[in-house]
Structures are given as structure tokens and as C-alpha cells.
């Protein structure tokens, strides 16, 4: 398993790069499920709910009755498969959260046994505390699974107080996740790209400057 984070300013192409990677993953017969954080952040775990609900539509047989009881609070669509599923009672919120996190891990692991799985969560700069905690948990628990956890976030929106900040800061030294920073193209980069595209090493500086400032 692997975790990769794409970071960069708004509009730099994080989602586009991820989309191209997902196309390649599908061509390699990987399962691909996508979730997006919302600016409102009014639904806890929203991107996971979105992605796992989609996964359930394609792989209903990967959920056991026991797992359904743990996941039903997060993925209500499970009731379509297990109408009797009810969340397991718990007087300890931390233990309940840990059971939920492990249930998500188990579900992803079961899904990946058939085919490798890519879980892409976009706009993580809008992640709530619960979502950030679950993302961190999954990233730490998938090394032995055939799962790629792919995320994208706006670097300038992740301050010290952001719920994902600690994970982003500590994940690379701990070798938990590889962050790929996307930067704007320099004037030199644009020139090199134009010359390659036009197959002309003599494209003039004014032309390159015009395109650089336009884009």
C-alpha cells in the first residue's frame, strides 16, 4: 500500500493530474473510488462516505453482517444490503471511533483482494477533524494492502491549526506518505515546453514571454 499527497496552489492542476493517474489506474484494472471534501464541512467524513458508498454499489459481497454493523453509521447505503444492520452500542466515543476506523480499513482490505484499489480524496484542505483522523489512520494501516490512498490539497490552506497539518508534517519523515508539490511553470519551463511542442528550437523570446504572461 502507498499514500501520495498532491499539494499546490489553487488551479495549479492537482485534480487534473490525479484524474490522469486514475485513468491509468483503470486501464490497469484497478478499482477507483473518489470522494471530495466540501467547503461547508457539514457532513463528518464526507469524502469517505462518498467513496465508500460508490464502492458498495460495485462490491456488495465484500461486506459481512458484522462489518455492516460497524459501517452503517458511516455508510447508510449498507441498509440496502443489510436492512437489519445497526451500529454496535458503545459508551466510549474513542473506542467507537477506533472500531469505525478499523472497519473502514477492513473494508478497503477486502475490496483490494480482488483487484488493486485506488482511493482518491480531493480538496483535503477542507477536511474536518474526523476526516483528517481517518485519513491518517488509513495511511498508517495500508502498507501491507493493495491500496493506493491518493489525496490533493491546497498548500496555502493547511496552517498549523488545520486538522491535517500534523499528518502532512510527520508523514514524510516517518515514510508514511509521499507529498508531491506542484509549482507554477517558470518562464524557462514554458519556453522548453513550447519548443518541444512545436519541434522548433528557434522560437523567439517575445513569443514565449507572450504565452507565459497570458497563461
Residue ranges, per PLM feature:
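Key residue(s) within conserved catalytic/signature motifs
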Residues: 1-215
Amino acid at each position: 500500500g502507498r499514500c501520495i499527497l498532491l499539494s499546490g496552489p489553487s488551479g495549479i492542476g492537482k485534480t487534473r493530474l490525479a484524474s490522469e493517474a486514475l485513468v491509468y489506474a483503470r486501464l490497469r484494472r484497478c478499482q477507483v473510488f473518489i470522494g471530495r471534501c466540501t467547503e461547508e464541512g457539514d457532513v463528518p467524513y464526507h469524502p469517505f462516505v462518498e467513496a465508500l458508498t460508490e464502492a458498495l454499489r460495485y462490491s456488495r459481497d465484500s461486506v459481512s453482517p458484522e462489518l455492516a454493523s460497524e459501517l452503517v453509521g458511516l455508510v447508510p447505503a449498507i441498509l440496502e444490503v443489510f436492512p437489519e444492520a445497526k451500529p454496535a452500542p458503545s459508551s466510549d466515543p474513542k473506542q467507537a471511533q477506533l472500531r469505525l476506523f478499523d472497519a473502514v480499513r477492513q473494508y478497503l482490505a477486502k475490496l483490494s483482494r480482488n483487484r488493486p484499489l485506488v482511493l482518491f480524496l480531493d480538496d483535503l484542505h477542507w477536511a474536518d477533524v474526523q476526516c483528517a483522523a481517518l485519513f491518517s489512520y488509513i495511511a498508517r494501516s495500508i502498507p501491507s494492502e493493495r491500496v493506493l490512498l491518493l489525496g490533493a490539497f491546497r498548500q496555502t490552506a493547511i496552517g498549523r491549526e488545520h486538522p491535517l497539518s500534523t499528518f502532512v508534517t510527520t508523514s514524510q519523515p516517518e515514510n508514511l506518505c509521499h507529498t508531491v508539490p506542484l509549482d507554477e511553470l517558470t518562464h524557462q519551463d514554458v519556453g522548453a515546453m513550447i519548443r518541444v511542442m512545436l519541434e522548433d528550437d528557434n522560437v523567439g523570446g517575445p513569443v514565449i514571454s507572450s504565452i507565459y504572461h497570458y497563461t
